[in-house]
A protein has these predicted regions:
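Short, Lys/Arg-enriched, disordered terminal segments
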Residues: 1, 282-283
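Non-catalytic, usually N-terminal nucleic-acid engagement modules in DNA/RNA processing proteins
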Residues: 1-80
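Extended two-metal-dependent nuclease catalytic cores across DNA- and RNA-processing enzymes
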Residues: 23-28, 53-54, 79-88, 94-282
């Protein structure tokens, strides 16, 4: 089993572990990077242990202009051609609301140091062609059962295959969990809905994704979405139910709005291929 590790999460989660504010003086205290490096190694080792990894992990990081520029300098040193930086395709698709428009999180002090450390010590894949690390992980896992996506990002659970979410603070670990393409919805102990596969995808098409500023359908909440999808057992049934609600809510704009929302929410599993609705009359 090969762990596919979402390092975008690690960059922030462990990055902030390298600094804190003194309660008495209010002074920002930075810890030595050696401490943080040890913390990173132990976290990755623990994740690999929890998923019973038999192969070294592959770490995924979403590209940025800064990272692409740095990698192009490295390519120049080795005589390779530079690679053009391509902005995440979802930003140009989002017309209703800016994609990730509510995120204003500052980067931890050691953010770029962690990237350098991971690239020097692990097998790191940096996303290309306007994809996010999430998409690259799903493309790697597509059609396989010998990999496991390790992330605390719920969106990745759309992808078929094995999944694991590690413990963080009061949030318990989830998995390993296996999902087929259809997937399922269930309720956690705290009452929150958790989903996998196409059921999660269609659920998000209804309720949206506040973390990424994707609105979904107006005035469709968790309870209505779960009730609509819970007892449907094929992609055709789920698509028809969601399509009908889109038409009811959005009228003549339903087709374009569905296209926008689906392209934003879909985790790319094959390069260049977005979500394709089932053909009419397909059994």
């Amino acid at each position: 089993m090969t762990p596919l590790l979402d390092s975008d999460i690690i960059l922030h989660e462990l990055g902030w572990s390298g600094q804190f504010k003194d309660k008495e003086t209010g002074e920002e205290i930075l810890l030595d990077f050696d401490f943080l490096a040890d913390l990173i190694d132990k976290k990755i080792e623990l994740i690999c242990y929890d998923v019973e990894a038999t192969e070294p992990p592959i770490l995924y990081i979403t590209n940025s202009e800064w990272l692409n520029s740095r990698m192009n300098k490295e390519r120049k040193w080795t005589g390779e051609d530079p690679i053009e930086y391509v902005h995440n395709f979802r930003y140009s698709i989002a017309t209703t609301k800016p994609y990730k428009g509510t995120r204003h999180n500052p980067k931890p002090f050691h953010f770029y140091n962690i990237i350098a450390y991971l690239r020097a010590n692990y097998n790191v894949v940096v996303s290309t062609d306007g994809y996010e690390a999430d998409d690259m992980m799903c493309m790697e896992q597509y059609g396989r059962d010998d990999t496991i996506i390790c992330s605390r990002d719920k969106d990745l659970r759309i992808c078929p295959g094995w999944h694991f979410s590690w413990e963080c603070g009061k949030q318990r670990a989830i998995g390993p969990v296996y999902t087929d393409r259809l997937g399922f919805l269930s309720t956690k102990e705290n009452g929150d809905t958790i989903g996998y596969g196409l059921k999660l995808f269609f659920y998000q098409l209804l309720v949206g994704d506040t973390a990424d500023n994707i609105p979904g359908l107006p005035k469709v909440g968790d309870a209505r979405a779960v009730k609509l999808l819970q007892d449907l057992h094929t992609e055709e049934e789920m698509f028809a139910a969601v399509q009908a609600l889109y038409i009811e809510k959005m009228g003549d704009n339903a087709r374009d709005y569905f296209r926008e929302q689906s392209q934003l929410l879909w985790m790319v599993q094959q390069k260049g291929v977005g979500y394709t609705p089932p053909k009419k009359g397909k059994k």
